[in-house]
């Protein structure tokens, strides 16, 4: 089934070329189906790239999904135009009276900053508090996962001696959990971060469960026992070339960056990267939409 997005969203053309089933708003209005209402709080600097990555995954399920975008009004974006934000995005003040079936909170390249030094931290706390009553299930990604774990459960982030950068094998900790239904015993996920989360604090919390982790990359997926809060520390949504672009960007800046692990064949950065996380990324988002959103949300969101 399709994703429903604004007719003139730039990501629409890219997704259509990839044969992702995109339905324009004008056509969707003629169908007598209630789509799942998903709101994406996009904290990434280059918002159009993240839009395309997430819409690609949301559009690969049997469910019709209507996507809205949010941004933080207390932060001035340097990499996304004001016109784009005004055309396609809303603030918490504009959506706070609405309810959504699901929400995605993206990462942001600010994990080394203390939370109270993030210029939109107070607004983000307001959004996360609002989500507890206005969203059926929220999926947090990378820094969004760290921020969510800290806000909701007091789990601290911890600095890493060097950047966790590469594609790593992961295992399933909790057999038969719905979020990982259909996953192989071992699967790969990209990571790109300077901080980790305190595993001991997660294990000590009665409302949290570590669903998946990696010997090299640490905790990967944490979920609340009721499924309303999902925290994913990696970047399953990344394109094949995203880590390569980050590596080349940091090298151009003169940073001491290592070649992403398990990414280029024989760690040779001149060769085409290996894409080996696509199937599991589609499955992760499909399972979340099906088991944690669609099967849990009321038909009438006003209830």
Swiss-Prot record:
Lineage of the organism: Bacteria, Bacillati, Bacillota, Bacilli, Bacillales
Marked site (Important for substrate specificity) residue numbers: 192
Annotated site (Important for acyl-CoA specificity): 111
Residues at the catalytic site: 142 (acyl-thioester intermediate), 235 (proton acceptor), 237
Membership in a protein family: Belongs to the MetA family.
CDD domains per the UniProt record, alphabetical: GATase1_HTS
SUPFAM superfamilies, per the entry: Class I glutamine amidotransferase-like
Coiled coil region boundaries: none
Keywords: Acyltransferase, Amino-acid biosynthesis, Cytoplasm, Methionine biosynthesis, Transferase
Broad class of where this protein is predominantly found: cytoplasm
Positions contributing to substrate binding: 163, 192, 249
Catalytic activity: L-homoserine + acetyl-CoA = O-acetyl-L-homoserine + CoA
EC number: 2.3.1.31
Name of the protein: Homoserine O-acetyltransferase
Xref: Pfam families: HTS
Location(s) in or outside the cell: Cytoplasm
Top class in the EC scheme: transferase
Gene Ontology annotations for the cellular component aspect, listed alphabetically: cytoplasm
Pathway: Amino-acid biosynthesis; L-methionine biosynthesis via de novo pathway; O-acetyl-L-homoserine from L-homoserine: step 1/1
GO terms, biological process: L-methionine biosynthetic process from homoserine via O-succinyl-L-homoserine and cystathionine
GO molecular function: homoserine O-acetyltransferase activity; homoserine O-succinyltransferase activity
Lineage top rank: taxon: Bacteria
Function recorded in the entry: Transfers an acetyl group from acetyl-CoA to L-homoserine, forming acetyl-L-homoserine.
